[in-house]
C-alpha cells in the first residue's frame, strides 16, 4: 500500500488556512507544511508572542511563506468571538480550518464562562470558533474543517448530566470526554453540511502517540519514556511530530478524503500509535447519532453560537451566508465565574 506523505500535497497557493494552537508541536508542523505548499496560514494561538515567534520560524525556513497571527484563547468565549471577527475581516474566503489546539489532564479549573477547562478548550471553544467563521468556509468551494481527536476518545464517555465535572473530577476522564466530543461534533457537523448541500466537509484526525507539550502534565517517568532520546526502545509506540501531523495534513489536503472520515496512523506493530496516515476507526460511542445531536444542542446553548448552514457552492462575493448567530451565553454554573478546585 502506498504511503501518503507531504509530497502528495498539491500546490495550495490562493488558499487560506487557520490552524489553532500553531505555536508549537503538531500545530506548528501542520502550519509549516501548509505554508510550504503555498497556503496563506493564520496561526491562532493563546499566546500572541509565541505565535509571532512561530511565524518568524516558519518564514526563516521559507522566505516565501505567508503567515499571520491572531490571538485566540479557546477557554474564553469573548476571545473566540474577537478572534473570529479578526479572521472574518482578514479572510473573505477560508479553505481550511484546523481545530488543533488542546489541553490534556490538567488540574480542575473553571473558565471565566463557568466551564470545566478541558471541555471548554478542547470542544466548546472550537465549536464556537467553527460556527463563527463558517460563512467564510461556505464561501470557498472545496473547503474543509479538520478537528483533532485522540486515541484517548476510546475510553471517553459523555456525562451529559455533569459536563462540567461538578460532581467529581478525574483529569483522564475529562480528557477522554473532550476527545469523544471532538468526534461527535465532526460527524454531526458533516451530516448537517451534507444535508444542506454545502461545499464544505468536516473530517477528524488523531496523531497517534507523539511527544508534544501536551505531555508536560504527565509524570517525569512517562515523559522520559516517550522522549526522543528513548527512541531506540520506544520506536514502535511513539513517533515524531512530523509523522504525527500527517493524519491531519491528509485529512486537510488529500483530494480523495471525504467528509465524515477519520484519519490516524496506519496500524504498525499491532498498535495504532505510529505509522503513515490512513483511515482510522473510532469508537462505537462516537457514532451514536443521539449523542451527536444532543451534544450539538448543548454546545449551542452553552456557547450561544447557533450555526447557519446554507447550500450552494460557490457563494458570490458579498452574498455569503450570514455568520453564525450569537445569542446570550448560558453559563454552566452560578457563583464565581472562574474557580479552582482545591
Regions of interest found by a model, annotated:
Residues 43, 72, 236, 284-287:
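Pocket-edge positions in alpha/beta enzyme catalytic cores
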Amino acid at each position: 500500500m502506498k504511503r501518503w506523505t507531504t509530497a502528495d500535497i498539491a500546490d495550495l497557493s490562493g488558499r487560506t488556512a487557520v490552524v489553532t494552537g500553531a505555536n508549537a508541536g503538531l500545530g506548528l508542523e501542520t502550519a509549516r507544511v501548509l505554508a510550504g505548499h503555498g497556503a496563506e496560514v493564520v496561526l491562532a494561538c493563546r499566546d500572541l508572542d509565541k505565535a509571532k515567534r512561530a511565524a518568524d520560524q516558519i518564514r526563516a525556513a521559507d522566505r516565501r511563506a505567508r503567515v499571520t497571527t491572531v490571538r485566540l484563547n479557546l477557554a474564553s468565549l469573548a476571545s473566540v468571538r474577537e478572534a473570529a471577527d479578526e479572521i472574518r475581516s482578514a479572510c473573505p474566503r477560508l479553505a481550511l480550518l484546523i481545530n488543533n489546539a488542546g489541553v490534556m489532564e490538567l488540574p480542575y479549573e473553571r473558565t471565566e464562562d463557568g466551564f470545566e477547562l478541558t471541555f471548554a478548550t478542547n470542544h466548546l471553544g472550537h465549536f464556537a470558533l467553527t460556527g463563527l467563521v463558517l460563512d467564510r468556509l461556505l464561501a470557498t468551494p472545496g473547503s474543509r474543517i479538520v478537528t483533532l481527536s485522540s486515541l484517548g476518545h476510546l475510553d471517553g464517555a459523555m456525562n451529559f448530566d455533569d459536563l462540567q465535572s461538578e460532581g467529581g473530577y478525574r483529569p483522564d476522564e475529562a480528557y477522554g470526554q473532550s476527545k469523544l466530543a471532538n468526534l461527535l461534533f465532526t460527524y454531526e457537523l458533516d451530516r448537517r453540511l451534507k444535508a444542506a448541500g454545502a461545499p464544505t466537509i468536516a473530517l477528524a484526525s488523531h496523531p497517534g502517540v507523539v511527544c508534544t507539550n501536551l505531555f508536560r502534565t504527565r509524570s517525569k517517568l512517562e515523559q522520559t519514556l516517550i522522549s526522543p532520546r528513548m527512541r531506540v526502545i520506544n520506536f514502535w509506540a511513539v513517533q515524531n511530530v512530523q509523522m504525527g501531523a500527517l493524519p491531519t495534513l491528509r485529512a486537510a489536503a488529500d483530494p480523495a478524503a471525504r467528509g465524515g472520515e477519520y484519519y490516524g496512523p496506519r496500524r504498525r506493530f499491532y498498535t495504532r500509535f505510529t505509522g503513515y496516515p490512513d483511515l482510522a476507526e473510532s469508537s462505537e460511542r462516537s457514532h451514536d447519532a443521539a449523542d451527536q445531536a444532543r451534544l450539538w444542542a448543548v454546545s449551542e446553548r452553552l456557547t450561544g453560537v447557533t450555526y447557519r448552514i446554507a447550500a450552494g457552492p460557490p457563494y458570490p462575493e458579498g452574498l455569503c451566508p450570514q455568520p453564525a448567530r450569537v445569542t446570550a451565553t448560558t453559563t454552566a454554573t452560578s457563583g464565581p465565574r472562574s474557580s479552582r478546585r482545591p
